[in-house]
Amino acid sequence: MNFKYIIAVSFLIASTYARSVKNDEQSLSQRDVLDEESLREIRGIGGALLSAGKSALKGLAKGLAEHFANGKRTAEEHEVMKRLEAVMRDLDSLDHPEEASEKETRGFNQEEIANLFTKKEKRIIGPVLGLIGKALGGLLG
């Protein structure tokens, strides 16, 4: 008689443990799904902010280019204008990476291509901010 109770209790404990393990696995998978959704939302927000920043920089660069295009320019202003035009081309290539030069992307895997565009963004943003600062300083000063 005691043997039957021992088997019944052992079976009850084993089934309870199996249910708890199954529940733990389900909660972990649900947590993973929520974490993944959060990461997607964060990436979406980051992409939107980056896109807005690029658009703002392009608009400001176009405005400065138009300002320098109208009227007489000094040699320094001419150089700034050339740099702004180069920046505009680079910003356009960032907006349309699939249309970027095939020479840059031929033979690279996807990760190398992503790194190439990230480096290009960093290379562009620094000089753009410097050019904008100089141009605004020239306009205000």
Swiss-Prot record:
Propiece span(s): 19-43, 74-123
Secretion signal span: 1-18
Asparagine amide: modified positions: N70
Residues that bear Leucine amide: L140
Tissue specificity comment: Expressed by the skin glands.
Membrane spanning stretches: none
UniProt-listed GO biological process terms: defense response to bacterium; defense response to fungus; killing of cells of another organism
Keywords, sorted A to Z: Amidation, Amphibian defense peptide, Antibiotic, Antimicrobial, Cleavage on pair of basic residues, Fungicide, Pharmaceutical, Secreted, Signal
Top-rank lineage group of the source organism: Eukaryota
InterPro entries noted in UniProt: Bombinin
Subcellular location: Secreted
Keyword Secreted applies: yes
Cellular component GO terms, alphabetical: extracellular region
Further facts: BLP-7 is also encoded by another gene from the same species (AC Q9DET7).
Protein family (similarity comment): Belongs to the bombinin family.
Protein name, UniProt field: Bombinins BLP-7/H-BO
Organism the protein comes from: Bombina orientalis (Oriental fire-bellied toad)
